[in-house]
A protein has these predicted regions:
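Conserved beta-strand edge residues that scaffold enzyme active sites
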Residues: 37-40, 164, 209-210
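GST-like fold's C-terminal all-alpha helical module
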Residues: 101-197
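Residue-level recognition of oxygen-bearing side chains
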Residues: 71, 187, 200
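Generic structural signal for helix capping and beta-alpha/helix-loop junctions
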Residues: 41, 192, 212-213
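Acidic/histidine-enriched, glycine/proline-rich intrinsically disordered or flexible terminal extensions
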Residues: 208-223
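A broad structural signal for alpha-helix termini and local helix breaks/kinks
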Residues: 27, 51, 80, 150, ...
Length: 223
């Protein structure tokens, strides 16, 4: 599946689709972007053949498709001949961080963001404060590990930004509503500031037709 004519990345502004758009723009991938809402009335028929889960992101091309942000990042990096998805000796290290992050740091961020952000955006019920506390405890434990790792180094793998950094930070662009105490971890906070200096990460939707997410009522976000 060479990225090129007829290749589309279907996305929304939610965390994992945002991640995929940031990857594609960072790599300069040859594709077009299309905002999508597979769960909207009348849309399931169109998107189910591309992804039976109906979740975004979806990379589609004539005759095929690929879903899940990690798989899409791997595919696009290979297509563009980039080491953004690390290969060779660095690949196990990168996969280690992807695996650990998914089950630990990113999971902690997701737990808190879902309660304070996603549920409140879409009216899915009150904040479950027990789950928030569990998420914050996991955040503190895993942020401490990243803090130790990032002292004296700029990126998680090697000497340049990689997909491991993008993936680890999946939920941090939404920290205005999640309220995770990132500043308590100076090396981790510096790492994220470096990531925000990468234009594709900081503003992946620049120039794209992409409706904003519903706002989170401010009185609910931290209640």
């Amino acid at each position: 599946m060479p990225a090129g004519v007829g290749t589309k990345l279907f996305f929304s502004r939610n965390p994992n689709p945002r991640l995929a758009v940031a990857v594609a723009r960072h790599l300069g991938a040859r594709l077009t972007f299309e905002f999508a809402s597979p769960f909207a009335p009348g849309q399931a028929e169109r998107f189910r053949p591309l992804n039976p889960n109906l979740s975004l992101p979806i990379l589609a091309w004539p005759g095929g498709s690929l879903w899940e942000a990690d798989a899409i990042a791997c595919r696009l990096s290979r297509d563009m001949g980039s080491d953004f998805w690390r290969g060779g000796e660095d690949e196990p290290d990168m996969i280690r961080w992807l695996s650990w992050g998914k089950e630990n740091f990113a999971r902690a961020c997701d737990m808190v963001h879902f309660e304070r952000g996603t549920k409140q955006r879409y009216g899915l019920g009150p904040i479950d404060h027990q789950l928030v506390e569990e998420g914050l405890k996991l955040f503190q434990a895993t942020a401490a590990i990243l803090e130790t790792t990032l002292v004296g180094r700029q990126w998680l793998v090697g000497n340049s930004v990689s997909y491991a950094d993008f993936r680890m930070a999946t939920f941090l662009p939404f920290n205005d509503v999640a309220g995770l105490p990132l500043s308590d971890y100076p090396a981790l906070a510096r790492w994220y500031r470096r990531l925000e200096a990468v234009e594709a990460w900081r503003d992946p939707f620049k120039g794209l037709a992409a409706p904003h997410l519903p706002p989170v009522p401010r009185q609910e976000a931290m209640r």
